[in-house]
Amino acid sequence: MAKRAKAPAKRRPAAAASAKVGELHTLLDFVRYAVSRFVEAKLAFAHGTSDPVAEAAFLVCEALHLHPDRFEMFATAQVTAAEARTILGLIERRVATRKPAAYLVNKIYMRGLPFYVDERVIVPRSFIGELLESHFGGEDGSLIEDPAAVESVLDLCTGSGCLAILTSRSFPNARIDAVELSKDALEVAARNVADYALENRI
């Protein structure tokens, strides 16, 4: 009985070669390249950004010391060779380590404000920040009639302290108790509280 010939093995698409300095020029070029690398590597997103485009833009902006909100303003600006090396290094680290981008740059943004994070805390991704603005601002539909009348707030499991800091802005006269079991996490929270000079309130 004749043997069946084996079907040829399917070839996997070749991995994309890493870009070199000088091949990419504008911020948009680097974002497009990063998105391709992230999708190829099947990275997960949910730690501060929800998709590869947002993650790529975040890393590019951080490498250039730009607030993410200003990306469109500089999208077509060209980068220097030194800046290109920094951006490419971050992109490759994100792919190689698979660590959340926030840990690579030690920063996360909530409600437009920057906060320090590292691996001692979970990357903040709570919707409470949005709720503070939409349901506790004192406007029509607010759950609290007068935010200025709130005297104390408890932030349980504060982690990086970012929600405690955001809460202090929503309730300007309140003392915030930021409670956390992890001593390491409290050190991160204390750093963020100090960055916003809120030691007397939190």
Task: Report residues per predicted region.
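N-terminal auxiliary segments of SAM/dcSAM-dependent transferases
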Residues: A2, K6-M110
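SAM-dependent Rossmann-like transferase core, predominantly class I methyltransferases
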Residues: A75, R85-P172, I176-A194
